[in-house]
Amino acid sequence: MASNNNSGISTLYTLHNLHKQQRSMNTSIERISSGKRINHAGDDAAGGAIASRMTAQIKGLDMSVRNASDTISLAQVAEGALDESAKVLQRIRELAIQASSDLYSGEEKLYMQTEANQLIQELDRVAKDTKYNEIAVLDGTFADRRFQIGNQEREAVTLSVGNLRTDKIGVHQVRTDATAGSDYTNLATAALRGTTNTIADEDFTIHGHLGQTTINVEANDTAKDIEGKINNKFDTTGVSATSSTNLKIQGLRTDATGSATLSLTLFGKNTTGRTISAGVTLAQNSVSTNDTDLSDLRDKINAYSAETGIVATLTATKDTVYLTNDEGYDIKLQDLDFADVGDAETHKLQVTGMDARLFDSTGAERLSGSAVNMFDKSFDNSNTQAAGYADSVIVSGQITMSASQSFTATTDYGDGDDGLFESSPGNATLTSVSTISLRTRSDALSSLKVVDRAMDQIHMERAKLGAVMSRMGQAIDNLTNVSTNTSHARSRIEDADMAAESSMLTKSQILQQSAMAMIAQASRIQQNVLTLFQ
């Protein structure tokens, strides 16, 4: 065996292994101290890129969780304000109910109106001043706001909160025969609607905030029938309906002064007519003096109110009687007879309704419109009916469609046709909370519907905000779950296996020590060659 000393091969091999163990030990020390398997791109190029992408995703998810939490905070601020607004509206509603009672004087109702006005101002203040991070949320400007709750561009939620100022909330309404008033006090301005009050076949479509539907009106439907058809579709459209029938009897005049008897058969919701025979005091050729007294007619009609659904009221001058059926049944006055007064030769009686149809004793239609004269002919003293004498009149009702949100109603009838509407109804008209009046019983009752629909709007917005809060809570849970699992996946890629690295470090340390010892041995071997020269 040759003894070569010049190259020092054993020492070179030992140094090479020492350097390898030194690098391995340094890597293990770096991984153990940092906790990461990948500290440089060279440690794992592909793994490093994947881990970096996952880190960006995790940070985006964590920020999305914060965004969702902030969205919940915003919704809580708005919902709390709406809760207070609902309480204010409830108080206004209490005042409206109180003011609708005739137990209070006009001055006392003025006090109620004063409180209502202050509450309305408070509602406006809440709508204007409710803000989150100086962003108003209830004044109508908070529309289509986007909240980023995901790691990607399109992962956002859109939220809009309606305008809850008092001039923007209330009841949206469309009335049939829209040119006429809503109650009997406005009947004098009612417009003609064709040749008959018998409703013709007609389709009209309601476009509500929940959806749209088409209502088929059949010939001879009463206002109550149509009301029922509309309300049956409430869940589809969000639009409800009420109906009422109003009739005014006035213009009782004669060319003589004295007492007479007015008789008729009355139909409302009853199918069997009720005969009314009332004494009437008349002023000669006058409809405006206090000498004309229809009190007995009012009392006789009201005696059957429970059966007919018709309530009669009398004006202060006692010369006009209003008949109202709040359920929308047609009001029919049949077999009308007016006994002569002394030697009177003329009598006159006028009936005013939203849609009145007049018949003579043979059943033939004589006249239709909003104001028809029952008697306007000359008579002799034999109580014989003249040719123009009317035997019966039918008055149909008015339908009011209402919703808390704006809606439209369209009909297949044109302007002037014999349909539900004098003209195309178009968009609903808003009666807002800001216009509430409690000064009269009628105003207070109307205010109830306004407040109720305004509360519906408040409830709708609260429901939207509650839904957003619930959704954000679920989003936070999901985002947290995704972030956690992604972090776990990243950990498996870039985190160091501490047990394995500790073992590797121990191994490297032992091998390093062994290499150092072997270098010493290799040096001695080379020194042994020198003994050959001694």
For every predicted segment, state its role.
Residues 1-534:
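Primary detection of the long, small/polar-rich alpha-helical "axial" segments characteristic
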